[in-house]
Amino acid sequence: MLDHINELPDWISRGLDDLFPNDNSGDSDQSFLKRLELSSVDKKPLRVKLGIDPTGTDIHIGHSILFRKLRAFQDAGHTAILIIGDFTARIGDPTGKSKTRIQLSKDEVQSNALNYLEQLGLGKDPKDSLLDFSIPSRIEIRRNSEWLENLNLSKVIELLSNSTVGQMLAKEDFSNRYKSGTPISLHEFLYPLLQGYDSVAINSDVELGGTDQKFNIAMGRDLQKAFGQKPQFGMLLPILVGLDGARKMSKSLDNIVGINEDSLSMYSKLEKVPDDLVLTYLNLLTNENLKELSSNPREVQKFMALKVTSNFKGIEAAKNAQFNSEKLVLGTKDSLEEIPEASVSNVNFPAKAFYLFSKMEMCSSSSEARRQILGGGVRIDGKKIMDPNLEFHTPDDLIGKILQVGKKKFLRVST
């Protein structure tokens, strides 16, 4: 961990990858510790910004890392500014993209935004939600269409004057596309400026983002200075590696754990996270003391699965998931480690149940699979399935789950 991060309170430093700028000279524009101190002295909570573009429908545990940090600021008495990027989502953040993103309609963005807020806990008890929506002074929900929808051409030109083509092409994603001859639409250059202008509009002190967001957050800092505001600090958190152990967690890569999944499915997936990621998951997704863990790697993995599941589903649901996971093999195996694994890479999705069990060689043929299912001999994660035509849309519907035929045939689905 960087020295300037070590100096921060634990609730801020945990999981933090970078804080910029990091000059602790005492200037509140350059020193976050000084800004934090002034906030306490003046009894003026920091305004902590997190922007989300509702380009999809589901939140996964990788997304939750940023929301957990925002909640930590709320719990410390500061104000969370949750910006719903209903305007910028129609452009699409070009970060990490090798081609221009498809633009979404207003209705699509609005529907996605409502789904996001529900998953974040709007209307729920704070102890059961990712963010605390119960105290008005602790959260502002803003939509950036409030200030971007009616931005006139004069203001757009003023924004554009604060950046250069050279600066934009220095951004890795643009640079790679430019060098390879892949088209870059002019509206994509606007995205970092519009995200930066969000910081001006809400006068943020801190902006949270993934490690891929440094350019955009720095743009916000520059624009705040140009508009006569105290510039924000950028706090960057890691991008969670997915269940495949190789690539970032992403629904399009079928390697996610969704926060809306049932507790047994969540626990089962987490229990099979690659060994080298277990401590990372514990560090980023829980508040557990990493110095007090078992020396047994398998026990640590089960502990991680239990604690992460309990954060989203509650401790009782997590314990039940762990118990039911073990019960799946009661009487046939001594432990879950004895269950063989198999990949669904050779299965064509969407897949019907009878085809799946035949393709995974759990049954000798599709007709046998139909007979077994109709006869009540087939289970998934301990739940009996009776419809041979039950459809699984993507590998993510199955990864981490245990397939069972009869009393002795088990298989755990892997990536």
Curated annotation (Swiss-Prot):
InterPro entries: aa-tRNA-synth_Ic, Rossmann-like_a/b/a_fold, S4_RNA-bd, S4_RNA-bd_sf, Tyr-tRNA-ligase, Tyr-tRNA-ligase_bac-type, Tyr-tRNA-ligase_bac_2. The keyword Isomerase does not apply. One of its GO terms (molecular function) is RNA binding. It catalyses: tRNA(Tyr) + L-tyrosine + ATP = L-tyrosyl-tRNA(Tyr) + AMP + diphosphate + H(+). It is found in: Cytoplasm. Keywords: Aminoacyl-tRNA synthetase, ATP-binding, Cytoplasm, Ligase, Nucleotide-binding, Protein biosynthesis, RNA-binding. A motif ('HIGH' region) lies at residues 54-63. One of its GO terms (biological process) is tyrosyl-tRNA aminoacylation. Gene3D superfamilies: HUPs, RNA-binding S4 domain, Tyrosyl-Transfer RNA Synthetase. Signal peptide: none annotated. A motif ('KMSKS' region) lies at residues 248-252. NCBIfam families: tyrS. Belongs to the class-I aminoacyl-tRNA synthetase family. TyrS type 2 subfamily. Catalyzes the attachment of tyrosine to tRNA(Tyr) in a two-step reaction: tyrosine is first activated by ATP to form Tyr-AMP and then transferred to the acceptor end of tRNA(Tyr). This is Tyrosine--tRNA ligase. It comes from Prochlorococcus marinus (strain NATL2A). The lineage of its organism: Bacteria, Bacillati, Cyanobacteriota, Cyanophyceae, Synechococcales. The gene is tyrS.
